[in-house]
Amino acid sequence: MNKDDLDLDLEIIDESPSSEGEEERKERLFNESLKIIKSAMENVIQEIVIKLEDGSTHIVYVTKLDWVDGKVVMDFAVLDQERKAELAPHVEKCITMQLQDAFNKRSKKKFKFF
């Protein structure tokens, strides 16, 4: 997902009075915005917030996730494409830790008899 994937028909707000009331206009704009967001997020499996050593914070959108031969295979999108390569090992580590934790919890449950 990147900014070029979205079709943004943004309304130019006119200062002149409209036939629709303020509340109706707000509701319509909210619904249009919600539709755009849902469309952009329909392929997102998980959102992760990562804070790098330099203090910068990045929202990562995981769009593909597989476990092949003991390794995580994934794809993700970020708003700052210039830092995607820098974020990749952090995203992979985060996903791997989550999967390992889930496998460990599942394995522990198999050995409980009550």
From Swiss-Prot:
Top-level lineage group: Viruses
Matching InterPro entries: Phage_T4_Gp40 (IPR021049)
Skewed-composition ranges (Acidic residues): 1-14
Region (Disordered): 1-26
A Pfam cross-reference name: Phage_head_chap
Function of the molecule: Helps head vertex assembly.
Protein's name in the database: Head formation protein
Source species: Enterobacteria phage T4 (Bacteriophage T4)
